[in-house]
């Protein structure tokens, strides 16, 4: 009799657990915060794609302000607001602009159950990794090698580096710039720093874009007869930079700041590309259009949109955590497996800073630059 009673109780417990799991399966939500189309279309479209994939009943989205530096309280409020919904079990912020760390800290005071994921963070690694469960970013520093390798292959004489003080205070951007300087010196390339208007300042993005459109021709005149490559650290400046370079035979574009087939290329070249669709088809369409401008050998990027992938994998990882197939908050092996399945050839590593400190929940992703001649 006792054995039978024990068996009945065990079955009841299992049924109760199954019922709870079923409820979790039906009610779970992942919240995603991205930039707007003007500041980060890829992330915005990735959030839309997540809704299409998982359903609006499971994915909720919002955007942070374009002037996020002066409206940080709005960003914090939106992230914290997600946690007010008891069905939200994970939050993905990409780009993780300033305010993300403060919001995550606030959420952890009352909702320790929520998985917190930061993508493309604009707060330094030691800051954001202390607040987030998982951080993902394209490998900024290693791009100091890949960008300069591309420039060397092109026979570049001068590299113009556009940025502004806010970006040049960020650890990873500074690390990339330092490596670019070292490589430029070794390769005999002149690296020239040019300060552009910050698009989050009062004059806004349009002032930054206009500056680029006016400055590129001036730089080409200054370095007449030389091969000049241009790079800017800001997403919103990419369309202007690509456009300004297009009709300059000696101007080169090694990659966008967030390398991808979709980062400004569709707008610059007048292409109707499904952002985040068929990457190879997108690369072929870009190559064909660049050929019309005799510019196939003057542009490069990465073969896959890492920023979009961060959101896609962030949601997939979160779902695994919610349903229990991923047991820990920070499962590096599983995260690398998901990233490499989505982007074959991706190099995934933990970030280690200049002092030798490795952050075990901060993951960087690196791809090789493309040669558009391979897509003709």
Predicted segments — roles?
Residues 72-89, 106, 207-226:
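Short, well-structured alpha-helical segments in soluble
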Residues 47, 139-193, 318, 334-340:
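An alpha-beta-alpha
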Residues 180-192, 239-323:
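Extracellular/periplasmic periplasmic-binding protein-like sensory domains
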Residues 282-376:
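Hinge/cleft segment of the Venus flytrap/periplasmic-binding protein
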Residues 27-77, 92-98, 173:
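Extracytoplasmic "Venus flytrap"
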Residues 133-161, 175, 211-214, 281-291, ...:
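Hydrophobic alpha-helical segments within soluble ligand-binding/sensing domains
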Residues 106-140:
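Flexible loop/hinge segments that line or gate small-molecule binding clefts
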Residues 30-34, 86-97, 114-119, 160-162, ...:
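Periplasmic-binding protein-like
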């Amino acid at each position: 009799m006792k054995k039978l009673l024990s068996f009945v109780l065990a079955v009841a417990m299992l049924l109760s657990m199954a019922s709870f799991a079923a409820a979790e399966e039906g009610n779970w939500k992942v919240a995603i915060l991205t930039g707007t189309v003007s500041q980060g279309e890829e992330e915005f479209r990735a959030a839309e794609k997540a809704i299409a994939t998982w359903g609006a009943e499971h994915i909720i989205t919002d955007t942070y302000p374009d002037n996020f530096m002066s409206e940080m309280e709005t960003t914090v409020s939106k992230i914290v607001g997600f946690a007010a919904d008891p069905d939200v079990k994970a939050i993905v912020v990409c780009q993780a602009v300033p305010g993300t760390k403060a919001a995550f800290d606030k959420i952890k005071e009352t909702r320790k159950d929520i998985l917190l994921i930061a993508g493309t963070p604009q707060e330094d690694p030691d800051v954001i990794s202390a607040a987030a469960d998982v951080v993902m970013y394209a490998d900024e520093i290693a791009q100091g090698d890949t960008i300069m390798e591309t420039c060397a292959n092109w026979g570049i004489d001068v590299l113009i580096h556009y940025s502004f003080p806010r970006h040049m205070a960020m650890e990873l951007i500074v690390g990339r710039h330092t490596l670019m300087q070292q490589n430029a010196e070794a390769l005999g390339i002149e690296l020239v720093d040019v300060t552009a208007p910050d698009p989050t300042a009062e004059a806004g993005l349009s002032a930054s874009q206009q500056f680029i459109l006016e400055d590129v021709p001036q730089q080409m005149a200054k370095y007449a007869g030389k091969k000049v490559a241009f790079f800017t650290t800001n997403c919103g400046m990419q369309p202007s930079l690509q456009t300004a370079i297009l009709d300059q035979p000696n101007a080169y574009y090694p990659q966008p700041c967030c390398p991808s087939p979709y980062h400004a290329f569709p707008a610059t070249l007048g292409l109707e590309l499904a952002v985040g669709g068929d990457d190879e088809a997108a690369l072929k369409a870009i190559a064909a259009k660049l050929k019309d401008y005799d510019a196939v050998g003057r542009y490069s990027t990465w073969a896959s949109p890492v920023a979009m992938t961060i959101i896609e994998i962030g949601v997939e990882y979160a779902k695994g955590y919610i349903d229990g197939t991923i047991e820990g908050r920070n499962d590096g092996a599983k995260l690398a497996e998901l990233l490499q399945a989505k982007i074959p050839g991706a190099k995934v590593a933990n970030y280690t800073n200049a002092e030798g400190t490795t952050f075990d929940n901060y993951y960087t992703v690196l791809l090789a630059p493309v040669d558009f001649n391979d897509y003709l």
